[in-house]
């Protein structure tokens, strides 16, 4: 497996990976997740590809000529003055592995790549958001040394 930076030529396969990931999330937690429109995804990912720079990395994992995953990391802005959060250089990341390739070390390799990139850019702490229903990903993150540190809560509201 090789990991390389994304290029504009990767747009279509990145859209497919995003759709695959959206379907996975919608299946495990349909109250929260949906499968977005392909054109809207294209706009979002095109901006992401064009916006790469020193404050982030966006890569794909390749098995031969096949893209089997993608991952990105972005260095977060420091907390504003008066914020209770410690001003530790932090980066947030996300990983997607194509169904059928999950559980084979691709996600782990992508995360380790992002961690090296972040450390080389002065980052001291990595964070991510993961659905409670995504048990496989949570297991991997724990194996890699990530710990639960915060909780986001959700309550659907109904109109009277």
List each language-model region with its residue ranges.
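Conserved beta-strand in the GNAT
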Residues: 60, 66-75
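A conserved beta-turn-beta hairpin within the catalytic core of GNAT-like acetyltransferases
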Residues: 77-93, 102, 124
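Conserved catalytic-core motifs of GNAT/GCN5-like acyltransferases
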Residues: 75-80, 127-131, 135-138, 142, ...
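Conserved GNAT acetyl-CoA-binding A-motif
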Residues: 118-129
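Conserved acetyl-CoA-binding loop-helix of GNAT-fold acetyltransferases
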Residues: 94, 103-116, 120, 139-144
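Conserved GNAT-fold acetyl-CoA-binding loop/helix
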Residues: 23-46
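A short beta-loop-alpha structural element at the N-terminal edge
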Residues: 2-16, 25
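A short helix-loop-beta-strand connector motif used in the catalytic cores of GNAT acetyltransferases and
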Residues: 43-60
């Amino acid at each position: 497996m090789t990991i390389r930076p994304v290029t504009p030529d990767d747009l279509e396969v990145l859209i497919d990976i995003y759709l695959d990931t959206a379907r996975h999330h919608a299946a495990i937690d349909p109250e929260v997740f949906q499968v977005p429109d392909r054109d809207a995804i294209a706009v979002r990912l095109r901006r992401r590809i064009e916006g790469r720079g020193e404050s982030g990395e966006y890569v794909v994992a390749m098995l031969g000529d096949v893209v089997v995953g993608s991952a990105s990391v972005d260095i977060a802005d420091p907390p504003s003055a008066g914020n209770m959060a410690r001003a530790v250089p932090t980066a947030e990341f996300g990983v997607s592995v194509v169904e059928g390739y999950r559980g084979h070390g691709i996600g782990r390799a992508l995360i380790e790549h992002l961690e090296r990139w972040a450390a080389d850019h002065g980052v001291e702490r990595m964070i991510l958001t993961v659905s409670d229903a995504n048990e496989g990903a949570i297991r991997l993150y724990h194996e890699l040394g990530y710990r639960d540190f915060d909780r986001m809560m959700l309550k659907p509201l109904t109109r009277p």
